[in-house]
């Protein structure tokens, strides 16, 4: 059984609306977006910003006969999550678990607002990394989950947070390829926004697995009946983790150098060397 579910976030939306007498969209706009200066985060993208949306999520699946079926019905700037659509995201009803469009700047503003206690108190922020799952009998572990986030934990098989980060660190991944990492102790934040599904194959029938081609860089593509190739996203998560690990490693090293070179002249030298 997978302990992860987004149903809790959907239920939390209803609780928030009942307690505050506000729509969930109104609540997070006032309590999060404005406090974090998130000016480019929208449930319904304004028409003047549509061209800035990165993709339409034209994802594909391969059927048993090798036919590739691509979803071209998704309009740029509209949700593709089926549960979000069912709840009414395209009509302006915030689902609670998905459906918002944002930018890297807004997401870093959000992460920094968390660290700087503009949204939550330090106690509440730290409590997000209290594991709600993970412990098993005989000193064994499963994946650690906190308050709708993935946590740092001992077993490398289930590792979700880069080891050198503090024990209060947490990570929130997105199905479409995004990832937000927050370390409130070391004050390190990282956001990755990448199209895991757009113009890629995310599901292949077992009969067609032999038609997967792997190159020298371990990049997988699927050979279509006409001989052309289409990228397969099955290894996307692994590739993203390599990128995230390198970026966080650089951030930690840079932070260490800041402690060694305490003056601006010294850090200017470090920046020049990099």
Language-model segments: which ranges?
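Short, surface-exposed loop or secondary-structure junction motifs
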Residues: 1-165
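Hydrophobic beta-strand positions
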Residues: 15, 181-182, 222
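Short, gly/Ser/Thr-rich active-site loops of penicillin-recognizing serine hydrolases
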Residues: 116, 129-136, 154-159, 199-274
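Short intrinsically disordered coil segments
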Residues: 163-169, 208-210
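Residues that act as N-cap/strand-start positions at coil-to-secondary-structure junctions
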Residues: 164, 174-176
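Short, surface-exposed beta-strand/loop micro-motifs that present aromatic residues
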Residues: 169, 176-189
